[in-house]
A protein has these predicted regions:
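Pore-lining transmembrane helices
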Residues: 14, 23-116, 134
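Short juxtamembrane and helix-loop transition motifs at transmembrane-helix boundaries
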Residues: 12-22, 44-51, 75-79, 104-108, ...
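Helical membrane-embedded segments and adjacent short helical loop/helix-boundary regions
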Residues: 20-36, 49-55, 60-63, 169-190, ...
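C-terminal ends of transmembrane helices
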Residues: 96-104, 125-131, 183-190, 228-240
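Intrinsically disordered, low-complexity non-transmembrane regions of multi-pass membrane transporters
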Residues: 1-22, 134, 233-242
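Membrane-embedded alpha-helical modules
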Residues: 135-220, 227, 231
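Helix-loop-helix junctions within the multi-pass membrane cores of secondary transporters/permeases
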Residues: 11, 84-174
Length: 242
């Protein structure tokens, strides 16, 4: 992604907030993604975490895929180290997003710290889809802040619900993590390469399940995906130089 197509900030037309496409997209992403927090909260409690541990994950880790991977490994009987490893590997992409958004939006002083916390799939997507610098800023901040607030709110609702209903399997919530994770993943499988990565990682996970302890297959698949991404980035740079 390149910011070269953005209209310079001092010449672009200013769109009112109420008419801004970036604001609408950001709010829509905030609501849609935030609702998944209910599933995370309930399943985190079922995995053995307390209410405050669950809230800390949403407030500090704050990346849905990593959070679901973390509790998925724990609920499957995996060790804490495997859960942390899986979550960390899935969160590597946010580092790339952060570098991209820093160059694109140029946040300064204390705003850079907040921007780092709300740099996720949704804020990156909302910013990248806009044609002007101002709209990209609006898309990033509206999506990032709205997802953060609603994700944490609905995590609390889900955690309280998890305490109330007991065994999530009685209510079908044991499958909610898979459904929620797929919901987060599905929009990113529209292109050929992400779909190929998902298929390869799925096959690797399935092959590893009978051979290694619980939680390790997710780590192995994450390493495969990370290696694929690094090799792809290197190949892209070589083509650009040639």
């Amino acid at each position: 992604m390149s910011g070269s197509s953005a209209v310079p900030a001092d010449t672009e037309q200013v769109i009112p907030w109420r008419s801004s496409p970036a604001v609408r997209v950001g709010l829509s992403l905030g609501i849609a993604t935030g609702l998944y927090g209910i599933s995370f909260g309930a399943l985190s409690i079922a995995a053995g975490l307390t209410f405050w541990q669950t809230q800390a994950l949403s407030a500090l880790m704050f990346t849905g895929g990593s959070q679901f991977a973390f509790i998925g490994v724990l609920s499957g009987g995996g060790a804490g180290a495997a859960a942390v490893g899986a979550a960390s590997l899935l969160g590597v992409r946010n580092t790339v997003y952060g570098m991209t958004m820093n160059a694109l939006l140029r946040p300064r002083s204390w705003r850079k710290l907040i921007a780092a916390q709300v740099t996720i799939d949704e804020s990156n997507a909302a910013a990248s889809a806009q044609p002007t610098f101002l709209e990209r800023k609006r898309g990033f901040w509206v999506a990032g802040v709205s997802v953060f607030l609603l994700w944490n709110l609905f995590t609390a609702v889900g955690a309280l619900l998890g305490d109330a209903v007991g065994d999530p399997g009685q209510w079908g919530l044991d499958g909610a993590a898979v459904a929620a994770f797929l919901g987060l993943l599905w929009p990113r499988l529209r292109e050929r390469e992400p779909l190929a990565v998902a298929v390869v990682c799925g096959v690797v996970t399935a092959l590893c399940i009978p051979l290694v302890p619980s939680g390790i297959p997710v780590l192995v698949a994450a390493v495969v995906a990370l290696t694929w991404g690094l090799l792809g980035a290197r190949a892209t740079r070589k083509r650009a130089r040639s």
